Amino acid sequence: MFAGHRWQIEGVDERRKVLQVVPHKGGRVPMFERRQAEASHDMLVAEMREVYRSDDVPAYLDAAAKELLVEGRQTYRHLKLDDLSMAADGGDLNLFLWRGSEFSAVFAVVLAMAGLNAETHDLGVTIAGATEPKVDAALATLRRMPAEDWERLPDFIKNIHSGKFDEEVPIELLKRFWLRRNRSLINDVRESIGLIAATSQPAPRQSKI
């Protein structure tokens, strides 16, 4: 978002600190904010989901906060997010992962490896220009992908030079550091891919014994 419009990044001039952009084809404000001021932990996102699921209204909320809570819960139930993982947003698709921002960031890189353009939001990722069948096909490709192919994951990071002195570090070394630092999250992503339910395919509920 910039100047009230959505833009698609087409190029990055890191030396001049310049982004080359074109108007986003969707041309509308996204439903979910895709840029986060700070990282969110798994436990925080899990607690947010429990708040959406609950009917309790904390006594300390003022009238405006109560109205926002009601709207959030109505949206959660309208999108059937207790059972479903995907929801269309104009020409894009929101994928709800219900994990922290670090997990979502790794998931976005994994989707890039499958040919999808994804950006993180507070509750997962938004996939630009995607449909449910397209995402399902990409996830199926990832499920079949051999372990050695996952070692190429850093090749799909949009900007691996995120640290202050990363420009001074050889890029292949940065890639190895990224793999080592995110190994457990990568394994979590691989496990979660088989559990994602498309909007047209509700996730089965587990029966209580």
Provide a role label for each language-model segment.
Residues 1-209:
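C-terminal effector modules of nucleic-acid-centric enzymes and ribosome-associated factors
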